[in-house]
């Protein structure tokens, strides 16, 4: 009996910290089991790019997903924060899949909208204040080739607050945010990554050795 328990423990030890059953993740996200297997191969590549511990550290995350991976950027930091659901400074496989699923084409817009609201709510107060909006607009511009002056960014923020803050309390609440998104659906454009609909085609080399079937 003891030998059996040891054998079972050794078998379970093959999975790194944070690993979750693909079938469970498939039941909670738009991804299929095979797609999650493909994402696991991608996750392994990312999580060993700098520190080989089966977890994605911020440096690895920024290097893989942002063109200015070596630079500090509030937007990049916020995305990492949102992926790090346990708030322990690293991204585990389950967190990676669940957070990435927000960007899936089949994920409802209200979920994408809620994710983006939290992204902009820097202090977690349930509101987006003008200074938070200004910081995030500047950070988003940092990921593009578009350069705007401080005055231009402030003008964008002032105009947005004027149009969105309907109850005139000086901040944007969740209902006001929903109305903004409803009137301007293009706001969520970057919240959808089309290739996630066909992960196994986007990353064909990752699934050659997969033995999992849906």
Swiss-Prot record:
<dbReference type="GO" id="GO:0019900">
    <property type="term" value="F:kinase binding"/>
</dbReference>
<comment type="similarity">
    <text>Belongs to the calcineurin regulatory subunit family.</text>
</comment>
<dbReference type="InterPro" id="IPR011992">
    <property type="entry name" value="EF-hand-dom_pair"/>
</dbReference>
<dbReference type="InterPro" id="IPR018247">
    <property type="entry name" value="EF_Hand_1_Ca_BS"/>
</dbReference>
<feature type="domain" description="EF-hand 2">
    <location>
        <begin position="71"/>
        <end position="106"/>
    </location>
</feature>
<dbReference type="GO" id="GO:0005886">
    <property type="term" value="C:plasma membrane"/>
</dbReference>
<dbReference type="InterPro" id="IPR045198">
    <property type="entry name" value="CNBL1-10"/>
</dbReference>
<keyword id="KW-0479">Metal-binding</keyword>
<dbReference type="GO" id="GO:0016020">
    <property type="term" value="C:membrane"/>
</dbReference>
<keyword id="KW-1003">Cell membrane</keyword>
<keyword id="KW-0963">Cytoplasm</keyword>
<dbReference type="GO" id="GO:0019722">
    <property type="term" value="P:calcium-mediated signaling"/>
</dbReference>
<feature type="domain" description="EF-hand 3">
    <location>
        <begin position="108"/>
        <end position="143"/>
    </location>
</feature>
<keyword id="KW-0677">Repeat</keyword>
<comment type="subunit">
    <text>Interacts with CIPK23. Interacts with CIPK14 at the cell membrane exclusively.</text>
</comment>
<feature type="domain" description="EF-hand 1">
    <location>
        <begin position="35"/>
        <end position="70"/>
    </location>
</feature>
<feature type="modified residue" description="Phosphoserine">
    <location>
        <position position="205"/>
    </location>
</feature>
<keyword id="KW-0472">Membrane</keyword>
<dbReference type="Pfam" id="PF13833">
    <property type="entry name" value="EF-hand_8"/>
</dbReference>
<feature type="binding site">
    <location>
        <position position="176"/>
    </location>
    <ligand>
        <name>Ca(2+)</name>
    </ligand>
</feature>
<comment type="function">
    <text>Acts as a calcium sensor. CBL proteins interact with CIPK serine-threonine protein kinases. Binding of a CBL protein to the regulatory NAF domain of a CIPK protein lead to the activation of the kinase in a calcium-dependent manner.</text>
</comment>
<dbReference type="InterPro" id="IPR002048">
    <property type="entry name" value="EF_hand_dom"/>
</dbReference>
<protein>
    <recommendedName>
        <fullName>Calcineurin B-like protein 8</fullName>
    </recommendedName>
</protein>
<dbReference type="Pfam" id="PF13499">
    <property type="entry name" value="EF-hand_7"/>
</dbReference>
<feature type="binding site">
    <location>
        <position position="165"/>
    </location>
    <ligand>
        <name>Ca(2+)</name>
    </ligand>
</feature>
<dbReference type="GO" id="GO:0005509">
    <property type="term" value="F:calcium ion binding"/>
</dbReference>
<feature type="binding site">
    <location>
        <position position="169"/>
    </location>
    <ligand>
        <name>Ca(2+)</name>
    </ligand>
</feature>
<feature type="domain" description="EF-hand 4">
    <location>
        <begin position="152"/>
        <end position="187"/>
    </location>
</feature>
<feature type="binding site">
    <location>
        <position position="167"/>
    </location>
    <ligand>
        <name>Ca(2+)</name>
    </ligand>
</feature>
<feature type="binding site">
    <location>
        <position position="171"/>
    </location>
    <ligand>
        <name>Ca(2+)</name>
    </ligand>
</feature>
<dbReference type="GO" id="GO:0005634">
    <property type="term" value="C:nucleus"/>
</dbReference>
<keyword id="KW-0597">Phosphoprotein</keyword>
<dbReference type="GO" id="GO:0005737">
    <property type="term" value="C:cytoplasm"/>
</dbReference>
<keyword id="KW-0539">Nucleus</keyword>
<keyword id="KW-0106">Calcium</keyword>
């Amino acid at each position: 009996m003891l030998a059996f328990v040891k054998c079972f423990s050794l078998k379970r030890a093959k999975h790194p910290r944070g690993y979750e059953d693909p079938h469970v993740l498939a039941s909670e996200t738009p991804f299929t089991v095979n797609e999650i297997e493909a994402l696991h191969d991608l996750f392994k590549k990312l999580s060993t790019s700098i520190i080989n511990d089966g977890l994605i550290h911020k440096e690895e995350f920024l290097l893989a997903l942002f063109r200015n991976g070596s630079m500090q950027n509030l937007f990049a930091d916020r995305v990492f924060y949102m992926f790090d659901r346990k708030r322990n400074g690293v991204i585990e496989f389950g967190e990676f899949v669940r957070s990435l699923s927000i960007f899936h084409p089949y994920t409802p817009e209200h979920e994408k909208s809620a994710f983006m609201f939290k992204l902009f709510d820097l202090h977690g107060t349930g509101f987006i204040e003008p200074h938070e909006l200004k910081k995030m607009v500047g950070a988003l511009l940092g990921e593009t080739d578009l350069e705007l002056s401080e005055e231009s960014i402030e003008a964008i923020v002032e105009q947005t607050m004027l149009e969105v803050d309907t109850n005139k309390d000086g901040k944007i609440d969740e209902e006001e945010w929903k109305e903004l998104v409803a009137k301007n659906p293009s706001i969520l454009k970057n919240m959808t990554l089309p290739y996630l609909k066909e992960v196994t085609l986007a990353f064909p080399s990752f699934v050659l050795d997969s033995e999992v079937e849906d």
